[in-house]
């Protein structure tokens, strides 16, 4: 604690926490502060990556746009290939000559399709390479920022449990969270681009334009469940940080080369092992409860989504049966339905990952805001 019972780090952490609504009328204020807090943390992470190297953000933007457009392009090419093949079959059945395969429309479409496949693989490999290189650079930059900050902070702060816990958490999260959040953010952008493309495709389906908004609407319960339980998971891990430290302490003691002799000499191995099991039991019980409840809700929403998908597939098949659309169109529209469902699900999970990651980055933000309070009597030589 600071002078007069003042704990600067705890106060800073409290400032980052959005107060829950006191009434229904207070909900808009709560949502506005929640969104502002989320984007504030996200912008902080983007700034960290930009300081590391502007080329990282520029590369990720380009890759995310290509990754979003390519699946839609692939679906359109597949549709054209199937429709072209259907036309060939119809001409054969009518006894009409279709000419040589080489130089035909089918052959040309296949060339474009395999060029697309090659380009898609190149984009995926480029994405992996940029992510790996950027991860190393960002980790180094954030670690250096923490080291510089640790040099400036008062020595007395290191004796405060609240401060040391934040320092430990910030140092641990620095290795993964910033680049993970950035990758997830641009992954969400690419999925959003794909989603818009698939919605446009379904909007062109005769008499089926309304299926796209329905598919998006039935995904809203999944989004609410996912975001709600990500927040609960974060709060649970925050409350149980003491348990995780104890488990790390007991497990590290058992494999510490400097302590193993004393542990054997005083017969403490079973004691530490039992203590680890006991602490893990309390930690695991609450975590399991959260996981089970979340997945029960997800199973219910998945069953509802599957039933609606089956109905839409049958409606599109009926259009083919009536001769209103072709086989390639059936492949395109059903693929768009499936892709919308999977893309929305992935978009929700990725967005929840970004949201959860920005919550954990509070540890780093709070630590970096800590100010020295002891004024030196002389200048540093």
Please annotate each region the language model reported:
Residues 74-78, 115-159, 163, 229-238, ...:
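Juxtamembrane helix-loop junctions of ABC transporter transmembrane domains
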Residues 51, 169-181, 235, 239-242, ...:
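An intracellular "coupling" helix at the cytosolic face of ABC transporter transmembrane type-1 domains
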Residues 57-123, 195-233, 307-314, 318-328, ...:
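Transmembrane helix-loop-helix hairpins at lipid-water interfaces of multipass membrane proteins
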């Amino acid at each position: 604690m600071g002078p007069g019972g003042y704990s600067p780090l705890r106060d800073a952490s409290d400032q980052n926490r959005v107060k829950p609504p006191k009434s229904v009328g207070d909900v808009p204020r709560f949502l506005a502060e929640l969104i502002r807090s989320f984007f504030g943390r996200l912008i902080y992470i983007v700034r960290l990556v930009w300081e590391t190297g502007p080329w990282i953000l520029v590369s990720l933007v380009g890759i995310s746009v290509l990754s979003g457009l390519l699946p839609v392009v692939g679906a359109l090419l597949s549709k054209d290939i199937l429709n072209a093949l259907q036309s060939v079959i119809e001409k054969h059945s009518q006894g009409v000559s279709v000419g040589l395969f080489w130089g035909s429309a089918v052959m040309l479409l296949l060339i474009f399709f395999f060029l697309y496949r090659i380009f898609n693989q190149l984009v995926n490999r480029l994405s992996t390479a940029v992510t790996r290189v950027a991860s190393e650079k960002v980790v180094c930059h954030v670690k250096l920022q923490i080291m510089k900050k640790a040099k400036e902070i008062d020595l007395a702060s290191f004796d405060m449990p609240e401060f040391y816990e934040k320092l430990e958490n910030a140092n641990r999260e620095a290795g993964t969270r910033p680049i993970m959040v950035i990758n997830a953010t641009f992954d969400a952008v690419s999925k959003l681009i794909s989603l818009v493309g698939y919605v446009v495709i379904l909007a062109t389906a005769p008499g089926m334009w309304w299926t796209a908004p329905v598919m998006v609407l039935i995904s809203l319960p999944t989004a609410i469940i996912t975001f709600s339980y990500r927040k609960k998971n974060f709060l649970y891990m925050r409350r149980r940080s003491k348990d995780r430290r104890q488990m790390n302490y007991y497990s590290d003691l058992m494999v510490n080369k400097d302590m193993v002799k004393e542990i054997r000499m005083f017969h403490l191995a079973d004691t530490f092992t039992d203590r680890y099991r006991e602490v893990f039991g309390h930690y695991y019980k609450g975590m399991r409860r959260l996981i089970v409840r979340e997945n029960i809700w997800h199973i219910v929403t998945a069953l509802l989504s599957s039933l609606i998908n089956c109905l839409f597939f049958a409606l599109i098949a009926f259009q083919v049966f009536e001769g209103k659309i072709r086989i390639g169109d059936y492949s395109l529209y059903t693929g768009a339905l499936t892709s919308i469902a999977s893309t929305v699900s992935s978009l929700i999970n990725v967005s929840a990952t970004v949201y959860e990651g920005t919550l954990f980055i509070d540890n780093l933000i709070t630590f970096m805001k800590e100010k020295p309070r002891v004024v030196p009597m002389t200048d540093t030589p």
